[in-house]
Amino acid sequence: MTLKWVPALLCAGLLTAQNLPRVDLHAHIHDEDHPAQSLTPAAVAALGKKLNVRFGILAEGGCGGDIHDNASLVEFIDSTAGQPVYRGLQVYGFDWPKCLSPENLKRLDYISADALVFPGKDGKDVLLWLPNVKFDDPQDFMERYVAYTVKVLSQPIQIWANPTYLPESLKSQYDALWTPARMQRVIDAAVAHHVAIELNSHFRVPSAAFVRRAKAAGAKFSFGSNEHVHGIGNIDYGLAMAKQCGLTRSDIYVPTRRSAR
């Protein structure tokens, strides 16, 4: 998939007062705890009209999860046919290009990834968003986390989701742990690989200092609520960061809408 930085090809009503595109590219429509409350693409499109937000429906998977093979990917893509929504896939791991064909991946509007499924020293994955995750040596964790993030950003993806997220136990040390050198290393990787940095409303990341540094380096940004059904369309944090850090329409990534065929 070739990444294109394009103007927001949206109707005039989907722009903010600062002329920024009102696009939520991190919207999950399935509620695993309450499946009956899950949304259809048509319902999402209707909600977008009500909220004045264009949605990117983000499926999850790769070689496992909801999207785990070509059949499940095609089913997801076909479910959005005829709806004014973007189609995205949040991938996990690094083997997903082996499980999903290039032909089907090209039917997506964008692919995102994050570093929150983190390899522990014992070889087991650590799910960084869980509440009881702790690291005895925060500095050692950060060195490994930054290196792993750079690896994630080297993939053929368009959006870095949940950027600079830290486990709950380390959030109070965010400014100290995300040193200028560490920030610059991941920013340089994002810019080099043309990956947009998500302004994430759920986790309220990244920081303004990070956004300013990334803008100075020529990075692009995207808006994402990172919500499941309830709360999708909330891009307030991203809009606030954009205003605070002087982002303009040209700084914001909006996908090229591809045919569902």
Where are these regions (language model features)?
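Domain-core and long-helix interface of multi-subunit machines
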Residues: 115-118, 125-219
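Short loop/turn motifs at secondary-structure junctions
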Residues: 51-54, 107, 155-159, 246-248
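A metal-dependent hydrolase metal-coordination microenvironment
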Residues: 19-143, 147, 229-232
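Charged catalytic cores and adjacent phosphate/nucleic-acid-binding surfaces used
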Residues: 2-13, 18-23, 174-261
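Alpha-helical transmembrane segments and their juxtamembrane interfaces
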Residues: 14, 36-38, 119, 172, ...
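Short secondary-structure transition/capping segments
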Residues: 71, 99-111, 133-142, 166-167, ...
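Alpha-helical scaffolding segments of alpha/beta enzyme cores, especially the outer helices
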Residues: 43-46, 71-79, 103-106, 147, ...
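Conserved, mostly hydrophobic/aromatic
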Residues: 26, 111, 162, 197, ...
